[in-house]
Swiss-Prot record:
Superkingdom, taxonomy of origin: Bacteria
HAMAP family registered for this protein in UniProt: ATP_synth_epsil_bac
Main location: membrane
Protein name: ATP synthase epsilon chain
PANTHER family: ATP SYNTHASE DELTA/EPSILON CHAIN, ATP SYNTHASE EPSILON CHAIN, CHLOROPLASTIC
Subunit structure: F-type ATPases have 2 components, CF(1) - the catalytic core - and CF(0) - the membrane proton channel. CF(1) has five subunits: alpha(3), beta(3), gamma(1), delta(1), epsilon(1). CF(0) has three main subunits: a, b and c.
Functional description taken from the UniProt entry: Produces ATP from ADP in the presence of a proton gradient across the membrane.
This protein's encoding gene: atpC
Organism expressing this protein natively: Methylibium petroleiphilum (strain ATCC BAA-1232 / LMG 22953 / PM1)
Taxonomic lineage: Bacteria, Pseudomonadati, Pseudomonadota, Betaproteobacteria, Burkholderiales
Molecular function GO labels: ATP binding; proton-transporting ATP synthase activity, rotational mechanism
Subcellular location: Cell inner membrane
Family indicated by similarity: Belongs to the ATPase epsilon chain family.
CDD domains: F1-ATPase_delta
């Protein structure tokens, strides 16, 4: 069976590297599904869950990404994430707290720049919570 090599990296570390049967993630224009021998592609990714179906045991790996860039080659997928957290390391309480703080920051923003920063943080935390709940269902 054909496989595709997947690397998920953040500024801090390599989060996942291995062979996969399938990768799904939130692209800028919608959900993307990538199989081996996919057409080359570069696109931005939105905050959300990256799902990797491992080739060795068929298990699914989940990684939350807070946006970034996706590069697809026929034999390789590279996710360059702004922030990436393994699914089992996500903390819903911290994410809820950060989401509330971002909501307050949006209410108290003194400039458009401050509002945009808070809005981005709010969207990232909402996506992280959604990814965590999706991960828990598996």
């Amino acid at each position: 069976m054909a496989t595709i090599h997947v690397d998920v990296v953040s500024a801090e570390a390599s989060i996942f590297s291995g062979e996969a049967k399938f990768v799904a993630l939130p692209g800028e224009m919608g959900e993307l599904g990538i199989y081996p021998r996919h057409t080359p592609l570069i696109t931005r990714i939105k905050p959300g869950a990256v799902r990797v179906e491992r080739a060795d045991n068929g298990e699914e790996e989940f990684v939350f990404v807070a946006g970034g860039i996706l590069e697809v080659q026929p034999d390789r997928v590279t996710v360059l994430a702004d922030t990436a957290i393994r699914g089992h390391d996500l903390d819903e309480a911290k994410a809820e707290e950060a989401k509330k703080a971002a909501e307050e920051a949006m209410k108290n923003a003194k400039s458009d720049i401050d509002f945009a920063k808070a809005q981005g943080e709010f969207a990232a935390m909402a996506a992280q919570i959604a990814a965590l709940r999706k991960f828990r269902k598996k």
